A protein has these predicted regions:
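Transmembrane alpha-helices and adjacent helix-loop boundaries
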Residues: 2-299
């Protein structure tokens, strides 16, 4: 039981990283990245291929995932940042599906639908509970570091420019701010964090396949960020932990509700997630941790 709880905490920390990746992109800049799971997959596959096939050390996996996600994020931003918000959302959603389809069909590289197994781990798997505790501590520590960095960026002059772009892009441009450059920087940082999460995920479970990177993951992460507050790292983190707690608790609905099959339980989980999103948007649109109003500078 303890091993299971530690495993859930480790997965929650990875989801928290994914939710944090939306803070700068969505919460601060106003860009809707529906291709989040694509960057998650890019980080996982890049890390797995270079540590398992190319023989790079396992500890380089998170760095590889971070750099791969950031690099692909930069390419996407340079291609799409001049699009309106709704078109950007559509393009990024399509990007995530392209990544999944390529991973499914390029068998020579990704193993196709069979995926990649035997991914080197950062810690010895023979340790049992110790292995899970070590990985949980690492994932939680990286989550805290990412949260602190994001918080510092949000409170910096750079973060204020992002909010100016979010509130009125034209005014920010007229004020002399290079909108495209700031958007590209925010998107690249967010994509890098998502890639880092993917590398950690692959290393932890030692196996990745296209079916693990469905669009549903993006929906879950957006729900987590919405519930906790998409403008603050602490809100995104809290939302991710609440989401994972509910997803795991709802697995046992079949034991609570009589006459419900396993298939029906899975359907009920998705219904409750959708209902939770509607309720959050209705009663707490700013999330549990709303954006703080900045005080005007005193003269």
């Amino acid at each position: 039981m303890l091993t299971y709880l530690v495993f859930i905490l480790a997965i929650a920390a990875i989801y928290a990283l994914l939710a944090q990746s939306l803070v700068l992109v969505w919460g601060q800049t106003g860009m809707v990245n529906l291709g989040l799971v694509g960057f998650f997959a890019i980080g996982a596959y890049a890390s797995a291929l270079l540590t398992r096939n190319a023989g790079l050390p396992a500890f380089s996996g998170p760095v590889i995932g971070l750099l791969a996600g950031a690099a692909v994020g930069l390419v996407i931003t340079l291609s799409t940042l001049r699009l309106r918000d709704d078109y950007l959302a559509i393009v990024t959603l399509g990007f995530a599906e392209v990544v999944r389809i390529v991973a499914s069909n390029e068998i020579w590289l990704t193993g196709g639908t069979d995926g990649i197994s035997g991914i080197p781990s950062l810690f010895s798997r023979t340790g049992g509970l110790t292995f899970h505790l070590q990985f949980m501590a690492l994932a939680t520590g990286l989550c805290l570091v990412a949260g602190l960095v994001i918080t510092r960026l949000v409170r910096s002059p750079w973060g204020r420019v992002l909010r100016a772009i979010r509130d009125d892009q034209v005014v920010a441009s007229v004020a002399g701010k290079k909108v495209v450059r700031f958007k590209a920087q925010a998107f690249m940082i967010g994509a890098g964090i998502a890639g880092l999460a993917g590398a950690l995920y692959g290393s932890y479970i030692s196996y990745i396949a296209p079916d693990l990177f469905l669009p549903l993951i993006t929906i879950y992460v957006f729900l987590a960020a919405t519930a906790g507050g998409n403008t603050r790292a602490i809100g995104a983190t809290a939302g991710a932990y609440l989401l994972v707690a509910w997803l795991e608790a709802s697995r046992f609905l079949g034991e609570v509700v009589p006459g419900v099959s396993a298939v029906q339980v899975a359907s009920l989980r998705e219904i409750t997630v959708g209902l939770a999103l509607v309720l959050v948007l209705r009663f707490a649109p700013g999330g549990l941790f709303r954006e703080r109003n900045e005080k005007a500078p005193q003269t």
